[in-house]
């Protein structure tokens, strides 16, 4: 019944098995990849006919984690998986980025890749397994895919690279780098690093590339057994049409791409397009070509003119040479009520970045496949349509926004202070107010400034830069701080973020094969020069974190109480802690180990809350005087609440120095009194006294009498 085929190899000391022919047999391609005991099913289905009216590759990649893979049931009312989590979105992009450039030009059939995590062994992260499985499924599917690709995760521990570190090993690594590519070239890199230098980062990329070669060979071996016949793609020869169009508009198009201002340039290019449309689609005549074909050829001309100009003259669209960074203006403290804020402008790209400091109540609860945890650093990236002069629908967060936000998060995360030293929940929001390339790196620069403006003690300021590449035969140009057009028309998008000491984040997407180690080395070196320049411009606004937190930011005090006192501080059903919060206005968070965090922007409120909590958690001392409140009046005395939640009895004989007939003659419920702790009776009940305390000044009358007697005794002994 099953026509099974499988290949198994040892990869990094663990077995990797690829199997097809048993599960999801109606998909064009389906592979179950097993690494250790982590299992991922990847399927590929491509439509039989091209999608009408599109001039792009209609590819969709979906990565999904099933909670049963970890032996768990989803939370929530419905008890089933909901919308994609942040990790699912990020891994979907991680798979999409290296496979998209490898489809044959002209493939317009709807293609969907679905990677489903079926089992997770809590050691091997499913993302790499999903990438490998997706590559294998595409290779078997018959889709025009110029793969296969391999992928690997690289760690760096004790000055040595580690292949596919386990989740436990990731705790100690200085590097988390994912690299994917073909047998000959690297296509994608995604990483976070603890300020590592360029040589270590490049070495990690090449280490990963070498070590995923056995995976590529295994996929090829499986394809030889089970691959479908490749589907044909009709490729139209546009050489003659391109030559004709070039003769028609070359001069105008070159002139348009010499205009440095984006909106003016787009207007000029628009007029050239109108000329092309008027020429090829004259009114009243049957057109010779369809509009998509003309638009595609025009786009090719745009790319060639921009690329030739850069390689031939060294001049870019806006007149810069390949290494120059656009003009930068950095400002901090731009929003009066925000805890920290910055406006970072680089050419026609601008980010307004805002930092908000919160408490433990604001931590994000993450219910991940590998377990639940709390996230104390959040970075959100928003890209509204007005930033590029367009209208658009505002709605849910898009995949691109999630991806760019995570890239900026990775750049900043390594320089944050440890949470035990700076016990705040930190949220950074980057609002892209203008965009013409490199908005994610503007977010990194703005985030660094906004955090320092808020008083967050970063290890060092952090900056980011986006690099591009133009490669024609053996000629190439690496471009610093690319524009949006240079991103679209170039061969590489290479984002590098870090401090003056090293790289904290590296993301690379390459659209062509043939990027050599030499080119990557040049790009990294040029990126370092650009990063140092940008850090210098940022320093004109702020060089280090402010000594004090923002005026409106909460202050947090941390202290410990005995664990057996936690229940008393919280109270039945949270009654006591709610009262503390309501009456003082401070926020209180108590952890299982007895760590208490009290937060408030009002210093007096914080002091009151701390005093209240400590009074509950501490034990009163015999002989000390305390403020109290009469809570109950009885015939034999009064019960007084003191020292937080403690209650004690003032016997009728201890109410006043004179004889008291009725307790109510001296006190009534609600009276504020001063009491001295005399001790405890045989049953452990607290004994208090009012008569030995001056109810006005709080002075200990008993102690005063003893002092007086002590002074009197020597005089009597002398015969006075």
Curated annotation (Swiss-Prot):
Cite the InterPro entries for this sequence: ExoRNase_PH_dom1 (IPR001247), ExoRNase_PH_dom2 (IPR015847), ExoRNase_PH_dom2_sf (IPR036345), KH_dom (IPR004087), KH_dom_type_1 (IPR004088), KH_dom_type_1_sf (IPR036612), NA-bd_OB-fold (IPR012340), PNPase (IPR012162)
Q: Using the chain's own numbering, where are the disulfide bonds?
A: none
Q: Which CDD domains match?
A: KH-I_PNPase, RNase_PH_PNPase_1, RNase_PH_PNPase_2, S1_PNPase
Keywords noted in UniProt: Cytoplasm, Magnesium, Metal-binding, Nucleotidyltransferase, RNA-binding, Transferase
Is Nucleotidyltransferase a UniProt keyword of this protein? yes
Domain KH positions = 554-613
- Pfam (any one): RNase_PH
Q: What is its main location?
A: cytoplasm
- Gene3D superfamilies assigned: GHMP Kinase, N-terminal domain (3.30.230.70), K Homology domain, type 1 (3.30.1370.10), Nucleic acid-binding proteins (2.40.50.140)
Question: Which residues does the annotated region (Disordered) include?
Answer: 699-720
Enzyme class, broadest EC rank: transferase
List the catalytic activities from the record. Answer: RNA(n+1) + phosphate = RNA(n) + a ribonucleoside 5'-diphosphate
The keyword Disulfide bond is assigned to this record:
no
Listed binding positions for Mg(2+) are 487, 493
Q: Where is the S1 motif domain?
A: 623-691
Biased composition, class Basic and acidic residues, residue ranges: 701-720
UniProt xrefs under SUPFAM superfamilies: Eukaryotic type KH-domain (KH-domain type I), Nucleic acid-binding proteins, Polynucleotide phosphorylase/guanosine pentaphosphate synthase (PNPase/GPSI), domain 3, Ribonuclease PH domain 2-like, Ribosomal protein S5 domain 2-like
Tell me the cofactors it needs.
Answer: Mg(2+)
Which domain of life does this protein belong to?
Bacteria
> Which SMART domains does the protein's record reference?
KH, S1
Sum up the protein's function in the record's words: Involved in mRNA degradation. Catalyzes the phosphorolysis of single-stranded polyribonucleotides processively in the 3'- to 5'-direction.
The family classification in the record reads: Belongs to the polyribonucleotide nucleotidyltransferase family.
Fetch the PANTHER family from UniProt.
POLYRIBONUCLEOTIDE NUCLEOTIDYLTRANSFERASE (PTHR11252), POLYRIBONUCLEOTIDE NUCLEOTIDYLTRANSFERASE 1, MITOCHONDRIAL (PTHR11252:SF0)
**Official protein name in the record:** Polyribonucleotide nucleotidyltransferase
Q: Which gene encodes it?
A: pnp
């Amino acid at each position: 019944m099953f026509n099974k085929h499988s290949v198994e190899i040892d990869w990094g000391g663990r077995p990797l098995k690829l199997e097809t022919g048993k599960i999801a047999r109606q998909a064009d391609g389906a592979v179950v990849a097993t690494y250790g005991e982590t299992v991922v099913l990847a399927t590929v289905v491509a439509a039989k006919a091209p999608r009408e009216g599109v001039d792009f590759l209609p590819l969709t990649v979906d990565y999904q984690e099933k909670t049963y893979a970890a032996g768990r049931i989803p939370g929530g009312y419905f008890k089933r998986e909901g919308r994609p989590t942040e990790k699912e979105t990020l891994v979907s992009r991680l798979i999409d980025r290296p496979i998209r450039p490898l489809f044959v030009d002209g493939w317009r059939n709807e293609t969907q890749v679905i990677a489903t995590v079926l089992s997770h062994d809590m050691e091997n992260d499913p993302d790499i397994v999903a990438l490998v499985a997706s590559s294998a499924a595409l290779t078997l599917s018959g889709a025009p895919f110029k793969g296969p690709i391999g992928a690997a995760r690289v760690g760096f521990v004790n000055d040595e690279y580690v292949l596919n570190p386990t989740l436990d090993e990731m705790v100690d690594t200085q590097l988390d780098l994912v690299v994917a590519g073909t047998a000959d070239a690297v296509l994608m890199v995604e990483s976070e690093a603890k300020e590592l230098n360029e040589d270590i980062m490049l070495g990690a990329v090449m280490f990963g590339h070498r070590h995923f070669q056995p995976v590529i060979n295994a996929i090829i071996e499986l394809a030889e057994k089970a691959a479908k016949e490749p589907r044909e793609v009709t490729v139209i020869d546009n050489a003659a049409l391109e030559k004709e169009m070039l003769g028609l508009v070359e001069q105008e198009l070159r002139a348009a791409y010499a205009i440095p201002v984006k909106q003016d340039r787009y207007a000029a290019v628009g007029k050239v397009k109108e000329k092309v449309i008027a020429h090829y689609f004259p009114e009243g005549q049957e057109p010779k070509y369809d509009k998509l074909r003309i638009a595609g050829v025009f786009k090719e001309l745009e790319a060639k003119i921009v690329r030739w100009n850069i390689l031939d003259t060294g001049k870019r669209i806006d007149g810069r040479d390949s290494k120059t960074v656009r003009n930068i203006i950095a400002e901090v403290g731009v929003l009066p009520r925000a805890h920290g804020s910055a406006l970072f402008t680089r050419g026609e790209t601008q980010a307004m970045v805002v930092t908000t400091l919160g408490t433990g109540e604001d931590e994000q609860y993450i219910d991940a496949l590998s377990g639940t945890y709390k996230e104390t650093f959040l970075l959100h990236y928003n890209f509204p349509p007005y930033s590029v002069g367009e209208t658009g629908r505002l709605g849910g967060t898009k995949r691109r926004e999630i991806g760019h936000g995570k890239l900026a998060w990775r750049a900043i995360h390594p320089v944050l202070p440890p949470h035990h030293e700076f016990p705040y929940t930190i949220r950074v929001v980057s609002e892209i107010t203008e965009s013409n390339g490199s908005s994610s790196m503007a977010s990194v620069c703005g985030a660094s400034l906004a955090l320092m403006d808020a008083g967050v003690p970063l290890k060092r300021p952090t900056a980011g830069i986006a690099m591009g590449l133009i490669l024609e035969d053996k000629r190439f140009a690496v471009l610093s701080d690319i524009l949006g057009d240079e991103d679209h028309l170039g061969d590489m998008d290479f984002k590098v973020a870090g401090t003056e000491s090293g790289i904290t984040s590296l993301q690379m997407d390459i659209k062509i094969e043939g990027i050599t180690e030499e080119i990557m080395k040049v790009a990294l070196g040029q990126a370092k020069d650009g990063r140092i320049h940008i850090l210098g411009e940022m320093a004109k606004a702020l060089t280090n974190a402010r000594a004090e937190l923002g005026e409106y930011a909460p202050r947090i005090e941390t202290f410990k109480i005995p664990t057996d006192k936690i229940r008393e501080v919280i109270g039945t059903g949270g009654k006591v802690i709610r009262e503390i919060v309501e009456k003082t206005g401070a926020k209180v968070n108590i952890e299982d180990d007895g760590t208490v965090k009290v937060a408030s922007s009002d210093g007096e409120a914080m002091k009151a809350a701390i005093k209240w909590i400590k009074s509950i958690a501490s034990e009163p001392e015999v002989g000390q005087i305390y403020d109290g409140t009469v809570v109950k009046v009885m015939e034999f005395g009064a019960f007084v609440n003191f020292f937080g939640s403690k209650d004690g009895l003032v016997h009728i004989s201890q109410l006043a120095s004179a004889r008291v007939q009725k307790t109510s003659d001296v006190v009534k419920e609600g009276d504020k009194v001063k009491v001295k702790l005399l001790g405890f009776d045989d049953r452990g009940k607290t004994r208090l006294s009012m008569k030995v305390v001056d109810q006005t000044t709080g002075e200990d009358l008993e102690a005063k009498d003893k002092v007086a007697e002590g002074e009197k005794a020597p005089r009597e002994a002398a015969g006075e």
